[in-house]
């Protein structure tokens, strides 16, 4: 797991390039904000989290007590060996994500979560980028 990068992943770089090309300026992993979100766009008061489906268990949510499956994502598989370790790890990751989201919205930030599977094909990227740009344009008007 030491080879797994927590920042500057290919999906993050793809999203940052799209934002830059569309005129949005941002900060990366701003340490002044709890949880160090992947991308911070102060002008729109927006945070963008680019999450890997496997590590953040896309399709699973923390309901306060346990993980609950809410959707199916082919990339969010679970290893068959050492299940206790992986279940505990994924539970911690999803719980931490939920805590950060709650803190960010309480602080008045607008949040967009982009899942790795939403960047796989050109069609999915186009749909994801349209959603992101539409929201950023709307939030930019409010500031």
What are these regions (language model features)?
Residues 1-143:
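Nucleic-acid endo/exonuclease domains
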